[in-house]
C-alpha cells in the first residue's frame, strides 16, 4: 500500500510502530487489520482510535492513530470476557425463559452476570449453559451496536424485553444521558456501552466456574440474584493452560498457606474481613514496612500518624463520603452534654487527615516538596460475597504517602514516585510490570471533581512523567479516581495472573477543597498540587499476593524464620544452642529444634515450613566449630565455619536476597 495519500478519499492511519498506512475513508478496523495481514484480521477483537477503544467494525472517517486489539493486548481480555457475559446471558435466556439480567461485567479473571430467575441454578445447569454458549458461538452471529435516545431504550426494555433492571439503570443511573447504546446478537439484546467482539464465533472455549448469591446493585435490601461466574478463551489450548494455572493457584492460595505457615488468622468472633496477624505473618509485614520506610527516608519522606476515625464532615468536605458511601461502615453518632449531635466514620481514606496536617501551618515555596507518609489503617464495608482473605478485607493498611509540591515540581515528583515503585517491585521479585495511565472519561465529566481544564493539565503532566521515565504504558479511559488521573502498576505473578498494586495519582481537586496554599517567591498565596502514592497499595492485599507469588517460599531477608538449627543427637544440643544464640545475637531470626526426632524428620519439617536455611549439627561439625548448611529446595550446600556462615547470611539479608 502506498505511503502517501493518493486521493481525497484516503485517510492516514498511524500504527503503534509509527508507520503510516493509507486506507479509504469509511474503512473499518477489520479492513485495516486485513490490510496488514490475514492472521491479524482473524485475531482482531477491536481497535483503539486515538487512545479510545472501539468496536472492530467502527467506520474510520479521518486521520487517526490506530491500534489493532487482540486477546494478547492489555485491553483484549476485558473486551473478550465482557462479550462472553452477553453470550452467557443469551444462553441462559434460551434455556431458562423469563430470566432477567442485572450487571454482567468483565472481571480480573473472566466475567459474571447477575441473574434473576425462578430457576435455582445448580452445577449441572452450568454444563448445560456452557454447551448452549458453544452452540451460539458456532452460529457466529454478528454483534451489532445500535445507538438510540434514552427514551427509546426505556420503551424497548419495557415493552420488548420486559427487563425492569435495565429500565431502572436507564431511568436512574443514566437519567442525565441523552443517548445510549444497545448491542444485538441473534435474538438477544443488552444495554451496554461496549466495545464488544465482532461476532459470537470468536469465543471457542468456555468454562463456567461457580454460582454465588448477590443483590441487585449490591444492596442487601434489594432483590436477591444469582451470580454466575465464568471464563472463556479464543482456543481450547488457552483454556487448558488456564485450568492448569487454577490448579496451581489452589496450591498457592494465600488462605491455605496462611493457615499452614501460621501467618494470619480470620476469626468470625472478630468479624468477617478483619484479619489478625500471627507472629510469623507480623514479621513479614514488619520487614516490608521497614524496607519501605528506609527507602522513603532516603527520598525525603517524613512520617505522620492519624486516628482510625474522623468526623463525617471531614469526609464530606473531601468528597469521599458521597463517593464511598455505599462501602462505608455506618456513622457512629454521639451527643455531647449540650445535646449536640456529632457523627464519626471509621476512616475510609487517609488523604483528608494528611491535608489537615499540611494546612496546620503556613507553608513557603521553600518548604516544598513536602512528603508525608503513613501506614494508615482504613475501613470499608465490603459485601460479604466479595471478601477474600487478605486480598479483599474490610480493614486494611495502606502505605499512603502524599506529596505537596509546586506545579513546576510536579513532573519531577511523579518521576520520583514512579522510580520508588519500580524499585520496590524489582526488589520483591516482580519482573513483569505493566503500567496503565488511568484517565478520566470526558463524556462523563460530572463523575469527577474539578474542571475539564484542570483534568487536561493533570493528564498532560502524568503522561510527560511516564514518558520521561521510559515507562511502556497503555491508556485506560474512565479508570481515573474522582479527583485526578493516576498511574497504576499491574504486576504479573509467578503463574501469570495480573494484580493491580501500586499507584501514583495527581490531584488538583483536594487543594481547592481544603484551601491548601503556600506563599510563593512573589509573597502571594498559591495552590500546591498533591500526589497520592502507594507502592504496596494495601499491606494485606500485597502480602496475600506475595504469599501466592512465592508459594510461601519467601526470600531469606523476608522469611519469618530465616534459619533452623537442627542438632542430630542430644549430645549436639549444647553446641547447637550456642550456634542458635549467636545467630540471634547477629540479628538473624532462628529456631532451635531439640526434639528427639531423627535428623531426616527435622529436615523434612523445616522444608515443609519453607525455612530458607537449615544448619545440621553433628559430631563432626561440633568438633570443628562448623555447621552443615542446607538451602530450602536446593539441598546440601556444604560445611562452613560458624562465624563465616553468619557473616555470609548477614550480608545476604542486608542485600535483601
UniProtKB/Swiss-Prot annotation:
Gene (name only): thrS
Entry protein name: Threonine--tRNA ligase
Cell compartment(s), UniProt: Cytoplasm
Domain of life from the UniProt record: Bacteria
Organismal lineage: Bacteria, Pseudomonadati, Chlorobiota, Chlorobiia, Chlorobiales
Enzyme Commission number: 6.1.1.3
Subunit structure as annotated in this protein's UniProt entry: Homodimer.
Function description: Catalyzes the attachment of threonine to tRNA(Thr) in a two-step reaction: L-threonine is first activated by ATP to form Thr-AMP and then transferred to the acceptor end of tRNA(Thr). Also edits incorrectly charged L-seryl-tRNA(Thr).
TGS domain segment(s): 1-70
Catalytic activity: tRNA(Thr) + L-threonine + ATP = L-threonyl-tRNA(Thr) + AMP + diphosphate + H(+)
Organism: Chlorobium chlorochromatii (strain CaD3)
